[in-house]
Amino acid sequence: MENREQEEIEPCVSITIDPNNNKLNVDDFDRICTIGTGSFGRVYLVQHRASEQYFALKKMAIREVVSMRQTEHVHSEKRLLSRLSHPFIVKMYCASWDKYNLYMLFEYLAGGELFSYLRASRTFSNSMARFYAAEIVCALQYLHSKNIAYRDLKPENLMLNKEGHLKMTDFGFAKEVIDRTWTMCGTPEYLAPEVIGNKGHDTAVDWWSLGVLIYEMMIGIPPFRGKTLDEIYEKIILGKLRFTRSFDLFAKDLVKKLLQVDRTQRLGNQKDGAADVMNHKWFTDIDWDDVQNMKLTPPIIPTLYSNGDTGNFDSYDECSDDEIAAPQHELELFEDW
């Protein structure tokens, strides 16, 4: 990348979606390359021919979605994202399907995964961790106001836009929870005790995961680790924490209050909700209006040489386009897609 001359990046042009016909026509886009892979699909960088704007196109094979019993999860992701609008949540523009795949069109987050930056630097400074935690708190406050539990907060699901601000992505596990839900889902090291114990859970699980994330950002590893899932789960249920001497005292206090095994005692899950987290001493210097309005200067400004730069993503082998059509009974599961 050092051999390329840096260009001035033009502001993105908004693609206009007809609110009465927000279906995606895949033929309107040129596929550039793969920027992510999953169990039943890929994410491509694509360019809209008419506007020359770049987007991320998520393509999921219908046969794989059904065989892996992810039908409800993908429906839920599309349904939730279509009604969410927040500066720290990825924007979904539209969706479509054919006899092979489901498609979802997202804004292109050229900065890549927060996970990549954390692994490269091993740890984040106290101020860096606080910046990202503050943006996450704003997003969680918004989601929880709509009774939505995100349920999969981790560095791999947090991406940076070209300015360096954070965006929550991958809403496959997100769910509207009026009372409690019992489905066990998420990443083992980030699961809350009530999920593991199958006691029913709600939005409180996100505050637990935030505690795990802050700890990992500042130490480089999650607080509960083990060689087996049972070992990890046992440590989570016990909830014993170890901190390095250099761990900021206010950050330590916040993490301990977020990682309360008893969900009724967990910060963020009490009467004043997210406001309790926002008012914690670790965030004393944070102006929450500035956070919400993206006025704070991000600690990491992604290196980009053009709007379609993919230098902040891993390289992937491109797969062939030989696809198998889904049978009619599977296609019927997505008639309202």
Curated annotation (Swiss-Prot):
One of its GO terms (cellular component) is cytosol. It is an enzyme of class 2 (transferase). It holds the Pfam family Pkinase. It comes from the Eukaryota. It comes from Ascaris suum. The active site is at D152 (proton acceptor). GO terms for molecular function: ATP binding; cAMP-dependent protein kinase activity; protein serine kinase activity. Composed of two regulatory chains and two catalytic chains. Residues 29-283 form the Protein kinase domain. This is cAMP-dependent protein kinase catalytic subunit.
